[in-house]
């Protein structure tokens, strides 16, 4: 199992758009992973006006293996009077890439039918994640979106970079000419340069070094602390505390 980190770096997103975007990222990833049988642990979403971040722990290396049961034509339609396979049986087998002899006769509530029963080995997650994450970018919706340059797809603001790591491997996403990498960017004013991300732990360490507080809850707490400290330091004001409206 490996951790997944996915960050969409953008120009300034309106503050009111962020929380709904976080929820969409979480819900879309969870549903897509379920549909693809990719097991995973906790899903965390966070960000700033210049980044939308998804972090998923303990993502399975591959899809879950399954036993596939595909129902074919009825036994009556599958054999002729001489007991040979009919075109219906042969066509069903051909469509599934097997020989008619690989089909089994099974009892169903509607009678006897041919069925293909086979083990399906799951594909590697690293090969599936580009589509999953690429679709999330395309499907995120906002009250207002825009197109820029010669791009055919819209987004809330121009995308500047894409960080996508599965463990230490870069997830091969490309969106409107922007290729995912292991690079992110620091605070726009205080540390406006790129840095390498090697893991989820590295991501948070580097963000702290580059003056970015990516967790919205922590950011609110810091703002409240700074405001209260300023109030207490001002002898012209009566002491008190500040409440932040979380709505």
Residue map of PLM features:
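Long, basic N-terminal domains or extensions that often function
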Residues: 1-247
């Amino acid at each position: 199992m490996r951790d997944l980190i996915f960050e969409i770096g953008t120009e300034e997103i309106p503050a009111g758009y962020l929380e709904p975007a976080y929820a969409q990222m979480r819900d879309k990833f969870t549903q897509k992973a379920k549909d693809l049988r990719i097991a995973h642990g906790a899903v965390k979403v966070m960000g700033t006006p210049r980044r939308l971040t998804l972090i998923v722990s303990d993502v399975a290396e591959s899809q879950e293996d399954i036993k596939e049961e595909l129902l074919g034509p009825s036994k009556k339609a599958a054999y002729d009077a001489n007991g040979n396979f009919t075109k219906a049986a042969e066509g069903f087998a051909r469509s599934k890439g097997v020989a008619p002899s690989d089909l089994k006769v099974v009892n169903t509530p509607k009678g006897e039918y041919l069925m293909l029963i086979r083990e399906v080995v799951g594909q590697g997650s690293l090969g599936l994640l580009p589509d999953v994450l690429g679709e999330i970018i395309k499907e995120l919706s906002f009250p207002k979106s825009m197109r820029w340059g010669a791009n055919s797809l819209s987004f809330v603001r121009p995308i500047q970079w894409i960080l996508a790591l599965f463990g230490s491997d870069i997830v091969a996403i490309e969106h409107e000419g922007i290729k995912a990498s292991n690079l992110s960017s620091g605070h726009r004013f205080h540390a406006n340069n790129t840095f390498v991300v090697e893991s989820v732990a590295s991501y948070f360490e580097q963000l702290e070094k580059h003056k970015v507080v990516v967790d919205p809850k922590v950011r609110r707490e810091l703002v409240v602390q700074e405001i209260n400290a300023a109030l207490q330091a001002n002898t012209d004001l009566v002491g008190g505390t500040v409440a932040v409206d979380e709505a």
